[in-house]
């Protein structure tokens, strides 16, 4: 036992004056971890830069450092190995309820729900290092404000049942895993900057499935923790987490697919510097398009703000508000009807 100085990667004797009240489930020890390597290989597929990135991410999650402001999202089909990875790390760091560093939270904390209790759950983040949540339902939407709050590094306010609110400095890192990526109700650069999408491709077939893997991984926990510490050192001395091309491309693709306003502009609007369209007509067209496509309909005020964020200006003439630089496309003319009596 003892204390790991994460700045040096060394195990030193614990001192009472440090007032450490949490501990991992195992003591780190160098050694191979082939089973865990096989779990990670499903992600990095032998790409050394992606492999090193994953270890830096896991190493950073040992710390309470909040400078990176990252939300990790592991996604892929069911039976792809995501749960095995997350549960192994959580087991190594120990359950926060029992004096460890890992804590599970409800995904409803970060997605829109009818009975919104996300802010009530913030207190569950206090003191944790590795926070994880499982996303299981398709069609959910990110609660952008709370996601940015949870990974923004700012002081948080939480409240326990029957207690007064209390403030605390965050120490956690947020990992979410699931089969479906939540939707974004609006293009959000804050989410894009923080989001790291890690894809688990393929599925584990019945022939590949090993029901003993989770138990056999336990023997590798000390070595895995040792490698996480090495990843933490790499993060500190290599200039930060970095974001491999695969991760950045996945985020760009995701954001493009969630950009409903951009899709409407491409499909329904001509961009002509000398033209303008009334704000009311533009919004009614967008609303009809969004409803027809099952998309989220933002308010007219938010619609105008999002257009301004994309560089479109507004003007007013004769009591009518206009959006400059756009013109609604004319609807396609219906095909001519053919009356056999006209022959």
Residue ranges and their predicted role:
Residues 1-80, 84-343:
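Feature primarily recognizes SF3-like P-loop helicase cores of small DNA viruses
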